[in-house]
Regions:
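Exported/periplasmic ABC-transporter solute-binding proteins
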Residues: 1-6, 10, 14-209
Length: 209
C-alpha cells in the first residue's frame, strides 16, 4: 500500500539495492535514481531486462515565502514585473544548469536580466528567498517539499528543460519475481502516484492512470 511504497522509496534514497519488505515478503529492487545508471546495470544483466518501470520525474518549481500574500504566480508574471529571482549557480549545480537552460529556452533570460540573484546551491536559493534578497526562487520540487513550512510552490515548471526520470527495476536474482512484478505494477496506480506527487516529484508522461 502507500505506506509501504513510501518506506521503500525512503530506503532506496540511502541504499541503491537491497531487500525491501512489501506485503508478505521481501522484494529485490534496484533504484539508483536517474535512468542512465539503471540502463547500464540492465546492459550488464545486473537487473532483469524488461522490468524497468519509470515512476517519477524531477521537476523545477517556483517558490515564494509562505507569508508573502501578493506574490507572482508564474515565471511569466515575474518577468513582467520588477521582482528578483533566486537561482542556483549554473556552473556548479545541476539545479542551476537546468534552471539556466529553462530560462533560455522559454525566452525569459533577457527580461530577467539584472534581476537574477545567483546563490551557491539550493540551500542558498532558499536563504535568499526567505531573507527577502529575492522575491521568488527556483528549486527542485522535492527540495521545496522539505521547506514547505517556510515557502510555498506557486508554479510547477515542466517545460524548457530535460527532466530527470527515476525508475526501478527487478534485481536479476530476485527470489520472488511475482511479488516484485506486483510492486512494479503498483507504482503506476493512482495511490502510488499520489505519494510520488506528495514527495515533490512529477509523474512520467504516459504513466498516469
Amino acid at each position: 500500500n502507500g505506506l509501504e511504497l513510501r518506506r521503500t522509496i525512503a530506503g532506496m534514497e540511502n541504499s541503491m539495492v537491497g531487500q525491501y519488505f512489501i506485503g508478505s515478503g521481501p522484494i529485490h529492487i534496484v533504484a539508483p535514481g536517474g535512468d542512465e545508471v539503471l540502463t547500464r546495470l540492465e546492459q550488464k544483466y545486473y537487473v532483469l531486462p524488461g522490468t524497468k518501470q519509470s515512476y517519477a520525474v524531477e521537476q523545477l518549481v517556483l517558490v515564494v515565502p509562505e507569508s508573502l500574500v501578493d506574490a507572482a504566480d508564474s515565471l511569466e508574471a515575474l518577468s513582467r514585473g520588477t521582482g528578483r529571482l533566486a537561482v542556483a549557480d549554473p556552473s556548479h549545480t545541476r539545479l542551476g544548469a537546468q534552471t539556466g537552460v529553462m530560462l533560455r529556452t522559454l525566452g525569459l533570460e533577457a527580461s530577467l536580466k539584472g534581476r537574477l540573484d545567483v546563490a551557491t546551491d539550493s540551500r542558498g536559493v532558499l536563504d535568499h528567498v526567505l531573507s527577502g534578497q529575492a522575491d521568488a526562487g527556483i528549486l527542485f520540487g522535492h527540495e521545496a517539499v522539505k521547506a514547505q513550512e517556510r515557502v510555498r510552490v506557486v508554479a510547477r515548471l515542466e517545460k524548457g528543460y530535460t527532466q530527470t526520470v527515476h525508475s526501478m527495476a527487478m534485481e536479476r536474482y530476485c527470489p520472488n519475481r511475482s511479488l516484485c512484478e506486483e510492486f512494479l505494477r503498483y507504482l503506476h496506480s493512482a495511490e502510488a502516484q499520489a505519494i510520488v506527487r506528495e514527495a515533490g516529484y512529477g509523474v512520467p508522461a504516459g504513466r498516469r492512470p
